[in-house]
């Protein structure tokens, strides 16, 4: 009976470990922030001058992106091209 309990506990732990949601670690954060899935969900915006499309980011521009339009109360219109 004791060994059956150990097997049941191991199976339960494996089940929980394999089925739980993914934990985003700090070193993953940039990957998650810039993932194709996240970018596809973002709203497009027009940069100053209207010649370029940007992407609206609520918490500011990610690394290697540039703020291409000012005047938003909250968030920024950012582009990877502008300012280079």
UniProtKB/Swiss-Prot annotation:
Q: Which GO terms describe its molecular function?
A: toxin activity
According to UniProt, the tissues expressing it are described as: Expressed in ectodermal gland cells. In adult female tissues, highly transcribed in mesenteries (gametes-producing tissue) and slightly transcribed in tentacles, pharynx and physa.
Q: Does the keyword Secreted apply?
A: no
In terms of superkingdom, the source organism counts as Eukaryota
**Where is the secretion signal located?**
1-21
What keywords tag this UniProt record?
Answer: Disulfide bond, Neurotoxin, Signal, Toxin
Q: List the disulfide bonds.
A: 45-77, 47-68, 61-78
Q: What does this protein do?
A: Has toxic effects on zebrafish larvae. It causes contractile paralysis and twitching of the tail within 20 minutes, followed by death within 30 minutes. Does not show any toxicity when injected into arthropods (cherry shrimps or grass shrimps).
Q: What else is known?
A: Negative results: does not show activity on all ion channel tested at 10 uM (hNav1.1/SCN1A, rNav1.2/SCN2A, rNav1.3/SCN3A, rNav1.4/SCN4A, hNav1.5/SCN5A, mNav1.6/SCN8A, rNav1.8/SCN10A, BgNav1, Shaker IR, rKv1.1/KCNA1, rKv1.2/KCNA2, hKv1.3/KCNA3, rKv1.4/KCNA4, rKv1.5/KCNA5, rKv1.6/KCNA6, rKv2.1/KCNB1, hKv3.1/KCNC1, rKv4.3/KCND3, hKv7.2/KCNQ2, hKv7.3/KCNQ3, hKv10.1/KCNH1/EAG1, hKv11.1/KCNH2/ERG1).
This protein is called what? N.vectensis toxin 5
